[in-house]
């Protein structure tokens, strides 16, 4: 057992860029432990992840704002404060804020994350229709 109080001591917010579109900040909740990574992630309006998937899965818990999540081959779905999403192993997806609002979620990623290409603007904007 390990108790981690608050945020990781000495950890600073990290601006994410290489696998995100737009302004995204992440704050680690705990260091990666036994293949589990937990981050609080803040997305400015229009910001989103690249397409990606997780070896074992991911849980998203939206703590503020609203946004979209999209599983490959499906229409984007609205997610908002209080929503929880389970993304299964190998499910290719993206998630982020919508065009008008910020979104903050706690992301618990289990196993390796495989990052892929950016989400095209026309695919992202399908959610706004």
What are these language model-derived features?
Residues 55-67, 72-73:
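Glycine- and acidic-residue-biased ligand/ion/polar-headgroup-sensing regions
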Residues 73-90:
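Short acidic-glycine-tyrosine-enriched beta hairpin
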Residues 1-36, 115-129:
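A short, N-terminal "cap"/entry segment at the start of jelly-roll beta-barrel domains
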Residues 59, 86, 100-118:
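A short hydrophobic beta-strand segment most commonly corresponding to one strand
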